[in-house]
Swiss-Prot record:
Residues 1-212 are annotated as: 2-C-methyl-D-erythritol 4-phosphate cytidylyltransferase. This is Bifunctional enzyme IspD/IspF. It holds the Pfam family YgbB. 4-CDP-2-C-methyl-D-erythritol 2-phosphate binds at residues 219-221, 245-246, 267-269, 272-276, 341-344, 348, 351. GO terms for biological process: isopentenyl diphosphate biosynthetic process, methylerythritol 4-phosphate pathway; terpenoid biosynthetic process. Coiled coil: none annotated.
C-alpha cells in the first residue's frame, strides 16, 4: 500500500450555508460531518495518517470527540490551512479533501491512487456538456475540465509550492506553479459538495440524534458597598455591589457553565479567563451571547434552562420575570425559568456576605432537515 496521508479541510466559516451551525458540525446520527467524512474515507483507503484542519477554537473540542486523528490550525486562506497541515505530513503522498465533499466513492479514490506514481498531482474532473463561451468567443468544450476534490499530490512538492506568495485555487494549480506534472482522472457526478442548506437534500444522511445533553453550573460572588447588583441581566437597586472581574452576574455565570457543561466544553474560566483585561467589567449578557453563538456553531440548540438564585438580600422575586425575558431572547428559547431562594440566614448568604446561583441547561442537536 502506498504511503498516503489524508488531510481533511474543515476550517471554513460556512458563510453561504446560512444556518446557525457550521456545515462541518451537522450531526449524522451522533457524529459531526467532519468525523463522518474522515471515517468514511479511512474505510475506503488505508491512510498512514489522518489530519483534520479546523478553526483553532474548535480543535480542543474535536480532540475530545476523536482522539485518533491529528489536528492542524486553519488559516486565512485554504492554502494557508493546507500549509499548516503539511507541516505534520511525513508520507510521500498527501490526499487532500474537503469536509463539504461528503460522499466520495471508493472507485474515485482508487482511480486517483492508481495514477499518483505517474504524476505529481492527480485531480478528478468532470467534462463540460454545454456550449461554452469566453466573452463572445466560443470555446471547444472538449478542452475544458471542471476540477473536483479530492486531489492527491507528492507532499514535498506541494509543500514547496505553498511556500511561495502566490494565490492558488487548488492543489493542482500549486503543483503546476512548482513545475510539477499534472494528471487527471474521471470524476464523479455524485461527489457533490455541500455549499447551501438545500444541498443536504441530495444526501441520504441519518438525521441528527435526539439525544438530550444536560449540564449544571454554580457561581458565587461576594458583596461590597454599592448601589445595585446585576443578576440574570437585570440591575437590582440595593445597598450592595458584587465583586468580580466582569459585572459579577452570578446567575448568568452559572448558566454559562451549565451550557458549556452540557456540550463538554469546559467552563467559563477557560473561555473568559480573569487574567484577560478585555473582560474587565464586561456585561455578562455579552459573554452569554458569545457562549450561545459558539454552541450553535457546533450544532447544539438550547432546549431549556433553569436557574436558582440564592440570596438573603435583596429580594429577587420582583425581577424574575424580567430575567426570564432577557435570557429567553439570548438563548432563543422560551423555556427559561428563574427561581429565588434564601438559606434561612445560614452561611455566607444568610450573613448577607454575597449571593450564589445554581443553573441547569438541556441541549440537543439542531435538526438540519429543517433548514
Amino acid at each position: 500500500m502506498k504511503d498516503i496521508t489524508l488531510v481533511l479541510l474543515a476550517a471554513g466559516d460556512s458563510t453561504r450555508f446560512k444556518a446557525p451551525f457550521k456545515k462541518q458540525w451537522i450531526r449524522i446520527g451522533e457524529i459531526p460531518l467532519w468525523q463522518y467524512v474522515a471515517k468514511d474515507l479511512s474505510q475506503k483507503c488505508d491512510f498512514s495518517d489522518i489530519i483534520i484542519v479546523a478553526n483553532e477554537k474548535e480543535i480542543s473540542y474535536m480532540k475530545k470527540i476523536e482522539r485518533n486523528f491529528k489536528y492542524a490550525k486553519g488559516g486565512k486562506l485554504r492554502q494557508n490551512s493546507l500549509a499548516n497541515a503539511l507541516k505534520k505530513v511525513k508520507s510521500e503522498f498527501v490526499f487532500v479533501s474537503d469536509t463539504a465533499r461528503a460522499e466520495i466513492s471508493k472507485d474515485l479514490i482508487g482511480r486517483l491512487i492508481n495514477e499518483c506514481e505517474k504524476f505529481d498531482c492527480v485531480s478528478p474532473f468532470l467534462g463540460v456538456v454545454d456550449t461554452t463561451y469566453l466573452g463572445r468567443n466560443q470555446i471547444d468544450r472538449n478542452d475544458l475540465k471542471l476540477i473536483q476534490t479530492p486531489q492527491i499530490s507528492r507532499a514535498n512538492l506541494l509543500k514547496k509550492a505553498l511556500e511561495s506568495n502566490e494565490i492558488f485555487t487548488d492543489d493542482s494549480a500549486a503543483v503546476a506553479f512548482a513545475g510539477g506534472k499534472l494528471g487527471f482522472v474521471e470524476g464523479d457526478e455524485k461527489a457533490r459538495k455541500i455549499t447551501f442548506t438545500s444541498d443536504l437534500a441530495h444526501f441520504d444522511f441519518t438525521p441528527a440524534s435526539g439525544t438530550i445533553f444536560t449540564g449544571n453550573g454554580f457561581d458565587v460572588h461576594a458583596f461590597a458597598k454599592g448601589e445595585f447588583i446585576t443578576l440574570g441581566g437585570v440591575k437590582i437597586p440595593c445597598e450592595y455591589s458584587l465583586v468580580g472581574h466582569s459585572d459579577a452576574d452570578a446567575a448568568i455565570h452559572a448558566l454559562m457553565d451549565a451550557i458549556l457543561g452540557a456540550c463538554g466544553l469546559g467552563d467559563i474560566g477557560e473561555l473568559f479567563p480573569d487574567t484577560d483585561d478585555s473582560f474587565k467589567g464586561i456585561d455578562s449578557k455579552i459573554l452569554l451571547q458569545k457562549v450561545v453563538n459558539f454552541v450553535h456553531l457546533l450544532g447544539f440548540k438550547i432546549i431549556n434552562a433553569d436557574i436558582t438564585i440564592i440570596a438573603q438580600k435583596p429580594k429577587i422575586s420582583p425581577y424574575k420575570e424580567k430575567m426570564c425575558e432577557i435570557l429567553s431572547e439570548i438563548l432563543q428559547t422560551s423555556r427559561v425559568n428563574v427561581k429565588a431562594s434564601t438559606t434561612e440566614k445560614l452561611g455566607f448568604v444568610g450573613r448577607v456576605e454575597g449571593v450564589a446561583a445554581i443553573a441547569s441547561a438541556n441541549l440537543g442537536y439542531f435538526d438540519w432537515r429543517k433548514f
